[in-house]
Amino acid sequence: MEHLDVGPLKAARGTVKLPGSKSISNRVLLLAALAEGETVVRDLLDSDDTRVMLAALDTLGVRCEPLGTANAYRVTGTGGRFPAKSADLFMGNAGTAIRPLTAALALQGGEYTLHGVPRMHERPIGDLVDGLRQVGARIDYTGNEGFPPLAIRAASIRIDAPIRVRGDVSSQFLTALLMALPLVEGSGRPVTIEVVGELISKPYIEITLNLMARFGVQVERNGWASFSVPTGVAYRAPGEIFVEGDASSASYFLAAGALGGGPVRVEGVGMSSIQGDVRFADALNRMGANVMAGDNWIEVRGVERDDGKLHALELDCNHIPDAAMTLAVAALFADGTTTLTNIGSWRVKETDRLTAMATELRKLGAAVEEGTDYIRVTPPSHWTAPAGGIDTYDDHRMAMAFSLAAFGPVPVRINDPRCVAKTFPEYFTAFGGIAA
């Protein structure tokens, strides 16, 4: 197996220009494809997941033309109706692609199949399918019930009651419905989505609502319990849109700035960000890091304690589910036990991240308690360098988060480092540029 040996690292300093946000990139691509008019998308993330979305849109007949400048595309909108009325779509392991596309395709009146890598066929999609079936969508499971692959058939869509969808497994189900429902033919009469259970990852819904508004569709919400979505309205191309830097990816460099003394600055995301994971900086500050920020940048200059340790903390991570993985590894360097709660969504990501995180932290000597939706980490009393290395489970965020363990007293071997291509292909080059 390919591996990368990192550390032990003693210092971190420098500036990193972040790649575009995955969550924003794939939402913007789909909205631009569904809109009336042309959208120039700039600073689009170049990664496995965005390539999956671009390939799917191409198969569906959407023109996405790369421009001369880096990571810029001109997307010619379809006015809500894809030219291709039948297609077989490979979705890799891109949840941000398969879920919103499933909803949009269910309303197209065509015949489509969606499938992916084996892990994708283990990631639940039943709550979204149940929601779409409430309006008459015809979607069949061709493998295990509740999971991809999916077969979508032409259907007569009708909305005569509120749509109910669970919110406690993945916010992407709600995002998919929100983005698709304006495509339903109608007079603009709104349809109500009712959320069953507690909605997790609320900041990702904020991203969805913000971007829908940029494309001319306003959604009204009643707290987080229900949403009123207009139907029969057209998305309108905004002309040009810039993709923010990825706030989840920023977390690794900010943590490095704390553990390695800094200063480390990330550019492309800051206090004006629409991404919830930007609040990772607040959590890092609570752990004792020296954090400064502007509208489009965040900088960390070491920690306030002379011994370089972080403060242990207990934190509800509903608002930073991806960046919370960085906190779990940073907890190796705390002065006590850190508890991260409300992270049940980790179990349905690229891997079961709760079990994976607990397993790999223990390899380094940490004492770890893994619960249904929480993890409790006590730093090692004696660090160990696992002979077999840190396994990454084909999960980009496992690989990136555990690079921070190299600030400990032992070298760290990262297995399958190329899995970072899902969102940040050049991560280890960028990390090596600021850490030594």
Curated annotation (Swiss-Prot):
<dbReference type="InterPro" id="IPR036968">
    <property type="entry name" value="Enolpyruvate_Tfrase_sf"/>
</dbReference>
<feature type="binding site">
    <location>
        <position position="353"/>
    </location>
    <ligand>
        <name>phosphoenolpyruvate</name>
    </ligand>
</feature>
<keyword id="KW-0028">Amino-acid biosynthesis</keyword>
<dbReference type="GO" id="GO:0009073">
    <property type="term" value="P:aromatic amino acid family biosynthetic process"/>
</dbReference>
<feature type="binding site">
    <location>
        <position position="27"/>
    </location>
    <ligand>
        <name>3-phosphoshikimate</name>
    </ligand>
</feature>
<feature type="binding site">
    <location>
        <position position="349"/>
    </location>
    <ligand>
        <name>3-phosphoshikimate</name>
    </ligand>
</feature>
<keyword id="KW-0808">Transferase</keyword>
<feature type="binding site">
    <location>
        <position position="172"/>
    </location>
    <ligand>
        <name>3-phosphoshikimate</name>
    </ligand>
</feature>
<dbReference type="GO" id="GO:0009423">
    <property type="term" value="P:chorismate biosynthetic process"/>
</dbReference>
<feature type="binding site">
    <location>
        <position position="22"/>
    </location>
    <ligand>
        <name>phosphoenolpyruvate</name>
    </ligand>
</feature>
<feature type="binding site">
    <location>
        <position position="322"/>
    </location>
    <ligand>
        <name>3-phosphoshikimate</name>
    </ligand>
</feature>
<feature type="binding site">
    <location>
        <position position="201"/>
    </location>
    <ligand>
        <name>3-phosphoshikimate</name>
    </ligand>
</feature>
<comment type="pathway">
    <text>Metabolic intermediate biosynthesis; chorismate biosynthesis; chorismate from D-erythrose 4-phosphate and phosphoenolpyruvate: step 6/7.</text>
</comment>
<dbReference type="InterPro" id="IPR023193">
    <property type="entry name" value="EPSP_synthase_CS"/>
</dbReference>
<dbReference type="GO" id="GO:0003866">
    <property type="term" value="F:3-phosphoshikimate 1-carboxyvinyltransferase activity"/>
</dbReference>
<comment type="subunit">
    <text>Monomer.</text>
</comment>
<dbReference type="GO" id="GO:0008652">
    <property type="term" value="P:amino acid biosynthetic process"/>
</dbReference>
<feature type="binding site">
    <location>
        <position position="22"/>
    </location>
    <ligand>
        <name>3-phosphoshikimate</name>
    </ligand>
</feature>
<feature type="binding site">
    <location>
        <position position="172"/>
    </location>
    <ligand>
        <name>phosphoenolpyruvate</name>
    </ligand>
</feature>
<dbReference type="InterPro" id="IPR001986">
    <property type="entry name" value="Enolpyruvate_Tfrase_dom"/>
</dbReference>
<feature type="binding site">
    <location>
        <position position="170"/>
    </location>
    <ligand>
        <name>3-phosphoshikimate</name>
    </ligand>
</feature>
<dbReference type="GO" id="GO:0005737">
    <property type="term" value="C:cytoplasm"/>
</dbReference>
<feature type="binding site">
    <location>
        <position position="422"/>
    </location>
    <ligand>
        <name>phosphoenolpyruvate</name>
    </ligand>
</feature>
<dbReference type="InterPro" id="IPR013792">
    <property type="entry name" value="RNA3'P_cycl/enolpyr_Trfase_a/b"/>
</dbReference>
<protein>
    <recommendedName>
        <fullName>3-phosphoshikimate 1-carboxyvinyltransferase</fullName>
        <ecNumber>2.5.1.19</ecNumber>
    </recommendedName>
</protein>
<comment type="function">
    <text>Catalyzes the transfer of the enolpyruvyl moiety of phosphoenolpyruvate (PEP) to the 5-hydroxyl of shikimate-3-phosphate (S3P) to produce enolpyruvyl shikimate-3-phosphate and inorganic phosphate.</text>
</comment>
<feature type="binding site">
    <location>
        <position position="123"/>
    </location>
    <ligand>
        <name>phosphoenolpyruvate</name>
    </ligand>
</feature>
<feature type="binding site">
    <location>
        <position position="397"/>
    </location>
    <ligand>
        <name>phosphoenolpyruvate</name>
    </ligand>
</feature>
<keyword id="KW-0057">Aromatic amino acid biosynthesis</keyword>
<keyword id="KW-0963">Cytoplasm</keyword>
<feature type="binding site">
    <location>
        <position position="95"/>
    </location>
    <ligand>
        <name>phosphoenolpyruvate</name>
    </ligand>
</feature>
<feature type="binding site">
    <location>
        <position position="171"/>
    </location>
    <ligand>
        <name>3-phosphoshikimate</name>
    </ligand>
</feature>
<dbReference type="InterPro" id="IPR006264">
    <property type="entry name" value="EPSP_synthase"/>
</dbReference>
<feature type="binding site">
    <location>
        <position position="23"/>
    </location>
    <ligand>
        <name>3-phosphoshikimate</name>
    </ligand>
</feature>
<dbReference type="Pfam" id="PF00275">
    <property type="entry name" value="EPSP_synthase"/>
</dbReference>
<comment type="similarity">
    <text>Belongs to the EPSP synthase family.</text>
</comment>
<feature type="active site" description="Proton acceptor">
    <location>
        <position position="322"/>
    </location>
</feature>
